[in-house]
C-alpha cells in the first residue's frame, strides 16, 4: 500500500495541486506529457521521453506558464529587420531588433541593462548586456544571487534607448548534479533520505533519483510567452531622466522575467545565438 503526504485533500486545498494514481507504464507517461502540454498552453509538449522505470514510485511535477503583453506595444516603425546579432562564437547572424525607449537603467561593473514592463506593471523583462570584452560565459560564472538582487533593487531612472531581438529559447536539464553542488545531498542518497511521510511500501526507502526541468520562452513585438516544468522523480531503493543610455542586445545577453513586487526572477536564461 502507499500513502501520500497528509492526504489528497490536503494537497489539493493547501497547494492547489492535483493528485493522480496510476500504473507506471507507457499510458501514464502519455498522460503526464498531456498534462504538461495542457498546463503550459502547448509550449512544452513533452516532459518524459520514456516510460518510468520499474523502481519509480512517484513524480512531483510543477508547471509555470507566463503569457503577457507589453505595457507599451511596439509599432511597425520600432522593428528593425535584418539587423546583425554577433553570436558567442563570433559569427554574424540576422536578427529583428525591437526598439523602444525605457526609463529604468541597470548597471554595475560588468554589465548594463534595462527593465521593460508588461501590461499591468507587476512583471518586467530585464535584459543584461555584459561589457565589451566580458564573455557571456565569464559573466554568468560570476553572477550571484546577491549581484542580481543588487541590480534589481537599484534601477536608475533615466532614458534608455533599448533594443531586444525577437527570440525563442528552450532548454531541457537534469538538475541533480547542480542541486548536489548546492548542498542538497541527502534527498538523493538512498541510505540517508527520509521521505517516509510521502509513503511507499513498508520495506522501501524512498529517495530522489532525478530532477527534470524544461523551459520554453518566446519573445516578440506583442509580448512574451514562457513556460517551465520541473519533475522530481522519487524511486524506492530497495526620478526625472538626466542621461540617455543605450543598451542594444545584439550580442550574447542575459534575460529575465521578473516579479517586480518581490524583485525575484520567474525565468532566467541567456541568448548566445539566434535560431537557425
What residue ranges belong to the model's regions?
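Single conserved hydrophobic/aromatic residue that forms the stacking wall/gate
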Residues: 1-6, 10-11
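Mature hydrolase/peptidase catalytic cores and their serpin-fold inhibitory cores, especially
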Residues: 21-276
